[in-house]
Amino acid sequence: MRRLPVTFDEITAPWLKEALEPSHSGLSVRSIAIGEAMHGTATKVRLHVTYDPASGASVLPSTLIVKGGFSAHRELMYREYMLEARFYSELAPRLDSIRVPQGLYAHHDDSQRQAIVILEDLDTCGATFCRVQRTLTYEQAAAQLDTLASLHAQWWESAEFASGGPLAWIDALDPLPEGVLGTYQRSRLQPAVYAECMALPRGVAVSSRFHDRDRMERAMERLREVDRVGPHCLLHTDPHLGNWYLDREGRPGLLDWQSVRKGPWAHDVNYCVVSSVDMLDRRAWERDLLQHYLGALQSHGVSPPALEEAWLAYRQQTGYGLYYWLVNPIEFQVEVNNCAVASRFAFAAIDHGTFELLA
C-alpha cells in the first residue's frame, strides 16, 4: 500500500482505487473531485467519485467521506486518529445493533503518524445530524442511552481488555494521563492556557468558581482515581450531541470513534445526558433517564449497579465534561458550541455538587 495522504492533493484516484480494491475486486476509479472540508479534531473531506461502470462499482456510492489528520495538529492527535481506524477495522464489524457510519477502509501508519478512514456519506443516506443547539426530548435521550447500554453491555468487564487480549490496545479512561498520551490533556491546565480559556465567552458564561485552576486540577486528579474503579466496559467517551445522528427511521447512531476507551459506564451516560438535554429538563429527567439506562443494561444481561450507587457515579463524572468543554480549543469546536455545552456542564456541576464529590 502506498503512503497515506497527509494533504488533500494526495487524495488521488489511484490512491482511492488501491484503498477500496481489497473489498471491491476489479474496481476502477476514473476521477475524483475534492468537495467540502469539515474541520475539527480530525478533518473530514467529501469526495465526488466517478467509477468505470465496467469495473462493477455500481454498489459504491458516488460520494464518500475521507477522514484523517489533514491539519497542523495531525502529529499531536495521531493516537486518536489511529484509534478510530482500529475501531472501524476491528470493533465496528462486531457491534451488536449499534448504528455507525459504514466503514469502507481503515488504515494507520505509525511512521507517518497518520490514520485514514473512508466512510459512507450520511448526507446521501437520509440521515439527520444532531446539533448542540437542538437539545433532546426525553424519548430521544432515552433512545441514545439504549444505544450506550448496548455498547457497554457487549464488553462489560470483558477479558478481552486484559494484557495480551484482542482489546489490550484500548487505553483506560484517564482525564489527565501521563506521558505522550497526556501531552494535550495536561497542557490545557497550564495557568496561562486555562486563564485564556476563562476569558473566552464559555468562561464568562459559567460561575467564577470554575475559574479556579488549582481546584479544577485537584478534581481531575481525584476523578482519575474514581475512573480506575470498575466495573469497566467499552466507552465511546465523547457522546455529545454533535457526535450523534438519526437515520431515516429516526433511530440514533454514533459518529467519531477516535476517543474509544475502556472505563466506567457513568462517564458516557453523564456526558450524553448533560451535554444533550436542556438544563431545566435535565434537572427534571436525569434520575429517570439513569433508571432507564440501568434497565437497558439489565435487558442485555448485565447486573447493573443499584440506583443510589449509580447516582453517585453519575454526578462525579460531571467533572470530566466540565473540564474539557471549558478548555476545548476553538480549532476543535467553534466557540458557540463550547459556550453552550460548558454552560450545561457548569450548571450540572453545581446541581450535582461535583467539586465536593471530587474533593
Label the model's feature ranges.
Residues 126-236, 248, 342-359:
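ATP-dependent phospho-/nucleotidyl transfer catalytic cores
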Residues 117-124:
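Short pocket-lining segment of the protein kinase catalytic domain that shapes the ATP-binding cleft
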Residues 238, 242-244:
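Catalytic-loop signature of eukaryotic-like protein kinases
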Residues 86, 90, 259-262, 266-302, ...:
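Active-site activation/catalytic loop segments of kinase-like enzymes and analogous catalytic loops
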Residues 302-318, 345:
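All-alpha amphipathic helical-bundle segments outside canonical DNA-binding/catalytic cores
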Residues 1-117, 223, 247-252, 359:
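Conserved NTP-binding catalytic cores of kinases and kinase-like/nucleotidyltransferase enzymes
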Residues 254-256:
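Pre-DFG segment of protein kinase catalytic domains
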Residues 94-99, 155-165, 297-306:
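Surface-exposed helix-capping loop/turn segments at secondary-structure junctions
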